[in-house]
UniProtKB/Swiss-Prot annotation:
Official protein name in the record: Nitrogen fixation regulatory protein
Entry function: Required for the inhibition of NifA activity in response to oxygen and low level of fixed nitrogen.
Lineage of origin: Bacteria, Pseudomonadati, Pseudomonadota, Gammaproteobacteria, Enterobacterales
Ranges where the PAS domain occurs: 23-93, 151-174
Ranges for domain PAC: 94-148
The keyword rRNA processing belongs to this UniProt entry's keyword annotation: no
Signal peptide: none
NCBIfam families, sorted: nifL_nitrog, sensory_box
Chain's gene name: nifL
Length: 495
């Protein structure tokens, strides 16, 4: 019988018989040289054969194993219920597969994955039990180590305050920690990365962005940082190709408090700059008033000198006139410059945002500030801080006057528009104009700028070559209009 004939018949018994006839001892040689531990017992579970791999695994020689029950290898580490299940299955003449903790001759314990099959004769009677087992101690140790590492990593990730997420090449989340899940829940169940509108593919490795997101109705600022992770394919078809599309690790930290502190620091510096500008404007206005007052007697002295004749020899008159002129010159030199920063073009929306942030705490249920613009793209030109000081002076004055009228809730409307190259700011309120013009501030003598807000506003507006209008509103209240040129060309300078 040839091998082709055996394949045509396709009968396992015939194939085995033919191979045995053509190659006597083939199956014995295969079992002897197999790397899998194989043992054979009789129907009473006494060992009748064990291959060399079995002997190496257990530490016993074949002579020591023959006629021994496999319980020789049993250890107390295997639960009794496992053995009960095994024998219940085998007595039903069904194969059983499971894991056992065996004990080698030297006392060492090892974990085996074992298959036991009842062997029946042609009459269906049980003759043998065939067992094949593999030592899986090393693979089990590695598996448990990996599981422990994963558990430890998950515990660490879930206990750090930052949100950690891993995304694939399509920006799909493949792993995240508890903090990220919490962020998503606070966003109403929406994906945080979608709400942030951030894509790691558009961010370079190690790049960081600070982005706002609305969480439970409040704006939070989150720092997003990305790192590329090398990918290893999990598909069996790519066993020989150790590569896969790269993934990206993203760490998202809440930096709202830090940003608020930075913003508060910036606002504090802005307040200091505005205060310095107001103080310089107050000093300049006071010196200008002094110059005007001093100019009258000096003019009178000059007229007296002309009447007496400049060469009349009136030493006292000449000395008084010269002292007056020198005093005027000294005062002129003492007038501080209002050039605190360079003229520039800047967007108006952040300008109003700063104004609102500076006065947010001073407006309550009885005081309302409404800001509108004709276009969100409006810009201003000049010294930004000084123009902000103009509005601040007016708000300070209006709030102080409104405090003297507690029966009337304060309403302030600020509107901005561009008109033929001029920026017009309309400040309307419900404080009577008479109150604005003639109100006296008790702090005028001990606080710079108190009680002279309108004069300081005029000084700053004039310095920017602007215009100011103050009038009563038909429906009651006061309307202040400030106009500033948007380019130097309107005032004779360069654009």
């Amino acid at each position: 019988m040839t091998l082709n004939m055996m394949l045509d018949n396709a009968v396992p018994e015939a194939i085995a018989g033919a191979l045995t006839q053509q190659h006597p001892g083939l199956f014995f040689t295969m079992v002897e040289q197999a790397s899998v531990a194989i043992s054979l017992t009789d129907a009473r579970a006494n060992i009748t054969y064990a291959n060399p791999a079995f002997c190496r695994q257990t530490g016993y020689s074949l002579a020591q194993l023959l006629n021994q029950n496999p319980r020789l290898l049993a250890s107390s580490q295997t639960p009794r219920e496992i053995y009960q299940e095994m024998w219940q299955t085998l007595l039903q003449r069904q194969p059983w597969r499971g894991q056992l903790i065996n004990q080698a001759r030297d006392g060492g314990l090892y974990l085996v994955d074992i298959d036991i099959t009842p062997v029946l004769n042609p009459q269906g009677e049980l003759e043998h039990y065939l067992a094949m087992q593999r030592d899986i101690s090393v693979s089990y140790t590695l598996e448990q180590r990996l599981r422990n590492h994963m558990t430890l990593m998950e515990a660490v990730l879930n206990n750090i305050p930052a949100a950690v997420v891993v995304v694939d090449e399509q920006d799909r989340v493949v792993m995240d920690n508890l903090a990220y899940k919490t962020f998503c829940a606070d966003c109403g169940g929406k994906e945080l990365l979608v709400e942030l509108q951030v894509s790691p593919r558009k961010m370079g490795p190690g790049a960081e962005q600070i982005l706002p997101v609305v969480v439970r109705g409040a704006v939070r600022w989150l720092s997003v940082t990305c790192w590329a992770l090398p990918g290893v394919s999990e598909e069996a078809s790519r066993y020989f190709v150790d590569s896969a599309p790269a993934r990206t690790l993203m760490v998202i930290a809440d930096c709202t408090q830090q940003r608020q502190q930075q913003e508060q620091g910036r606002l504090d510096r802005l307040k200091q700059q505005m205060t310095a500008g107001k103080l310089l404007a107050a000093i300049r206005e006071s010196l200008d008033a002094a110059l005007i007052q001093l100019n009258c007697p000096i003019n009178m002295l000059a007229a007296a000198r002309r009447l007496n004749g400049e060469g009349s020899g009136n030493v006292a008159l000449d000395a008084a006139w010269r002292e007056g002129e020198e005093a005027m010159a000294r005062l002129q030199r003492c007038r501080p410059s209002l050039e605190l920063e360079s003229n520039a073009v800047w967007p108006l929306q952040p300008f109003f945002d700063d104004l609102y942030a500076l006065y947010r705490t001073r407006f309550d249920d009885r005081a309302r500030l409404q800001v509108d613009m004709a276009s969100p793209h409006l810009v201003g030109f000049g010294q930004r801080t000084q123009l902000l000081a103009c509005l601040s002076l007016w708000l300070d004055r209006t709030l102080a006057l409104a405090a003297e009228l507690p029966s009337v809730p304060l309403e302030i409307e600020l509107y901005a528009e561009e008109d033929e190259g001029w920026l017009s700011l309309y400040l309307n309120d419900n404080v009577p104009l008479l109150q604005v013009r003639y109100a006296h501030s008790p702090d005028a003598l001990n606080s710079p700028g108190k009680g002279m807000e309108l004069r300081l506003i005029q000084t700053l507006v004039a310095y920017h070559r602007g215009a100011i209008e103050l009038a009563s509103r038909p429906q009651g209240g006061t309307s202040l209009v400030l106009r500033f040129p948007l380019f130097n060309t309107l005032t004779g300078g360069e654009q």
